[in-house]
């Protein structure tokens, strides 16, 4: 289905703010609502906990559209005791007059007809976010009940729905001051549709904080009213995406104090870019279209990369920071340690693929490239000290990349010469079918024997870690390729890393990290996850990385064996079987288990417990901050993180 948007003509303010006229005639109806309850995944992605939270985002995005249009500056989100949600804004209020085509109130149309809203047709909004613009009607269809209250032109209107159907028609219930305007939506997700019904404050906090960063001067309050969970957060950032970059760089050493900021309008597209280099060796670039994350990038990202690479190479040549005989800096060299936010506002964005996560609008590349090239060139000329610091870091990155390439090529040549090229310490499995195969990354020599003996040699491989795993958060690419433990993992997995990564070459569909259930084991697990997250993130995204869960206790009574994986489970088992005559042992390490115990608790797919490591693109910013906190140089943020999160840890061995 194609949706024709009216062509923009006018000044920049009108482009962003749209029309003050926001009545029933600005609401356009495009199709019905029948399919939503039958196939909810098509509209909100899934019926998991992610889909549950997506309902909140849909309503919030409608309020953000009002903020982008210049009519709203405060949004409040409340989680109530029964896990229902209220979203209140101080925008213009959804129109309540009769929509001519439907012959019913615009409020009813917005909540009962799919693809009905001011974002279609152009007069209500010039730019808007939201998933396919489905918004309010989909939330209504997937809710047990939904009540909406509109404050508009001195009057208060209400309307109620259940599972998408009207239960109480629109009614004016009183008056309010002319200043008290806006929309309040209160809904309870339908428990028969969603796998989970409990909202996570932390999940909502991350998304709402991001929204506030992207919408300068918008205030968002998140309130949890549930008993025992009462808390409140407020997000309000006058610095917008510049503050966002500073927030993401927290815990890292910035190479220069000011966040570089480029802003402008070109090709009817509004562009904002904020960036700052830090002393790390990884790049973190986040792209947004109309405040919606585009994790797969697209034309706006391409435009930025082109501008960045050309501008810095031109500057380095003109200022003799690069010799005539030296090669140009690559984009990767310049982006090493870069944190960047790219935000574009487009009236009619075009996306590629099914997921709508990659921008395809060709004009966005031209707009971003032009604005960044011009304004970044000016910034470098005005700030030669900053320009020199970035160029020097980029030149070091170029040299390290060349050294890493030599090390990588040497590894490949060795692999070709010795035939298979797998690490000598790897006890491989005989099956060549990756879907059946799994590899255990085992800490230390003591557990190696039982792991080798207890595994299924047909489908289970074992790779021991004997030396120290490198903390890649603090290491350049050449050091990573020089580390024997990491080299062993790269070779065993088969995928390569970084720009060479190829998921189709993965040799094992389960990569299982097996360490002691103590602080040292947790540290080694974190080092390995840091490496995989930074250089093979697709392994985590596709669900190939797992943490084994060896037991903490073994309990024997009346010739029966029980295993406890936490102190709570240990207490529960003792309570059930009675402590009299019970023989209890605590495993201090994997090496204390015999082959049968390790096989039963950790190796055998029928009896073991595994934790799959999950991540999504929505989590990326929060994950970057967490890994920086845990694996970075600064001690104080790490101590604060541990103190704040210790209560969530079940096996803390201090």
Role assignments for model-derived ranges:
Residues 2-23, 33, 55-57, 65-67, ...:
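GHKL-family ATPase ATP-binding module
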Residues 25-38:
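Mature N-terminal segment immediately following signal peptide/propeptide cleavage
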Residues 38-57:
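Conserved short strand/loop->alpha-helix "switch" segment adjacent to the catalytic nucleotide/phosphoryl-transfer site
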Residues 93-98:
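A short glycine-centered beta->alpha linker in the GHKL/HATPase_c
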Residues 99-100, 107:
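Short adenine-binding "F-helix/F-box" segment of the Bergerat
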Residues 399-418, 433-438, 449, 453-455, ...:
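C-terminal interaction appendages of subunits in large macromolecular complexes
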């Amino acid at each position: 289905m194609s949706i024709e948007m009216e062509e923009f003509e006018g000044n920049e303010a009108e482009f962003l703010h749209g029309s003050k006229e926001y009545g029933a005639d600005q609401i356009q109806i495009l199709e019905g609502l029948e399919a939503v309850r039958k196939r909810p995944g098509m509209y909100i992605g899934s019926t998991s906990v992610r889909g549950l939270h997506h309902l909140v985002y849909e309503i919030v995005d409608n309020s953000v559209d009002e903020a982008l249009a210049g009519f709203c500056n405060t949004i409040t989100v409340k989680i109530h005791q029964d896990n229902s949600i209220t979203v209140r804004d101080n925008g213009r209020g959804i129109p309540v007059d009769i929509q001519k085509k439907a012959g019913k109130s615009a409020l009813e149309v917005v909540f009962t007809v799919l693809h009905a809203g001011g974002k279609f047709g152009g007069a209500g909004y010039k730019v808007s976010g939201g998933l396919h613009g489905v918004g309010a009607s989909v939330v209504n269809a997937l809710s047990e009940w939904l009540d909406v209250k509109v404050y508009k032109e001195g009057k208060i209107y209400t309307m109620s729905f259940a599972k998408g159907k009207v239960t109480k028609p629109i009614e004016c219930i009183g008056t309010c001051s002319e200043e008290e305007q806006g929309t309040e939506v209160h809904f309870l997700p339908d428990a028969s549709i969603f796998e989970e019904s409990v909202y996570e404050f932390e999940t909502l906090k991350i998304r709402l904080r991001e929204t506030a960063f992207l919408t300068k001067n918008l205030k968002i309050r998140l309130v949890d009213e549930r008993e025992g969970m009462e808390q409140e957060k407020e997000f309000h950032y006058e610095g917008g995406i510049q503050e966002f970059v500073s927030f993401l760089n927290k815990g890292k050493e910035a190479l220069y104090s000011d966040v570089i900021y480029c802003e402008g309008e070109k090709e009817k597209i509004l562009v904002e870019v904020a960036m700052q280099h830090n002393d790390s060796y990884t790049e973190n670039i986040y792209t947004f279209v109309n405040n919606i994350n585009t994790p797969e990038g697209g034309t706006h990202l391409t435009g930025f990369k082109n501008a960045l690479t050309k501008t810095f190479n031109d500057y380095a040549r003109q200022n003799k920071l690069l010799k005539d005989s030296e090669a140009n800096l690559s984009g990767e060299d310049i982006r090493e340690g870069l944190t960047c936010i790219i935000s574009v506002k487009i009236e009619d964005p075009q996306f590629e693929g099914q997921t709508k996560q990659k921008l395809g609008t060709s004009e966005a590349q031209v707009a971003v490239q032009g604005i960044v090239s011009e304004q970044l060139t000016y910034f470098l000329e005005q700030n030669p000290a900053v320009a020199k610091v970035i160029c020097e870091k980029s030149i070091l990155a170029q040299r390290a990349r060349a050294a890493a390439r030599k090390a990588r090529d040497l590894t490949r040549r060795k692999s070709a010469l010795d035939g298979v090229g797998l690490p000598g310490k790897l006890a491989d499995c005989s099956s060549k079918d990756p879907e059946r195969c799994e590899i255990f990354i085992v800490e230390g020599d003591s557990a190696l024997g039982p792991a080798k003996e207890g595994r299924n040699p047909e489908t289970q491989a074992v790779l021991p870690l004997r030396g120290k795993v490198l903390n890649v958060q603090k290491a350049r690419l050449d050091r990573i390729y020089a580390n024997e433990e990491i080299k062993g993992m790269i070779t065993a997995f088969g995928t390569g890393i970084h720009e060479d990564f190829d998921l189709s070459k993965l040799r094992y569909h389960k990569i299982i990290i097996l360490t002691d259930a103590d602080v040292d084991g947790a540290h080694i697990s974190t080092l390995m996850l840091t490496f995989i997250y930074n250089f093979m993130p697709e392994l985590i995204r596709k669900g190939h990385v797992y943490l084994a869960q060896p037991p903490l206790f073994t309990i024997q009574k009346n010739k029966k064996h029980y295993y406890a994986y936490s102190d709570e489970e240990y207490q529960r088992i003792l309570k059930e079987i009675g402590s009299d005559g019970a023989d209890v042992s605590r495993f201090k390490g994997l090496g204390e288990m015999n082959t049968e115990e390790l096989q039963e608790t950790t190796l055998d797919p029928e009896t073991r417990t595994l934790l799959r490591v999950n991540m999504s693109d929505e989590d990326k910013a929060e994950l970057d901050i967490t890994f920086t906190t845990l694996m970075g140089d600064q001690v104080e943020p790490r101590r604060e993180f541990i103190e704040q999160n210790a209560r969530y840890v079940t096996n803390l061995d201090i």
